[in-house]
Amino acid sequence: MGCGHGRVEGVSAKENCVCEILRDIVDAQNDVIENCCDTSCEQSINDLLGETDPGNGLDTVPVILYCAGDCKPFKGFGARRGNGLGTIGKLQSSFIFRVKSVTDDCCAVLELLRDPNDPCECDHLKDPCDQSTHNLENTGICITVDLDCFCHVTCLPAISVFD
């Protein structure tokens, strides 16, 4: 049986049976206990907006993006200006970003977030688990991306990166 050919009692042929069964499971779970994730985009946004703790001082929802197609975590690169005009500082990388803006045509400006005590070598970070999240700070390094190139976003708990 291929996609769309599975039959479940009470589910019409036009409906996706896996989708319907998962909906039924969620409905049943919601009847038993509040179905709330401790960490999710919704929770991070609520924390940022102070809905869970007003006046908490949080200002950023850090995100990790996953490239469409291979579904691998996206690592951004950039550098600050060097010590003088026309010079480039040390190249840095990060899997974790602060969304600065999103345009109508789904392009976004992302700022690299890093722990200043984490080594800055670009080869050091092979995947998001290699990156320290203990003391993320804004870097001032921004990149522009096409959001149509991503298939997944992970929101980390809301934090404060500005003093």
Task: Kindly give the residue locations of the regions a language model identified.
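Short glycine-rich, low-complexity segments
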Residues: 1-163
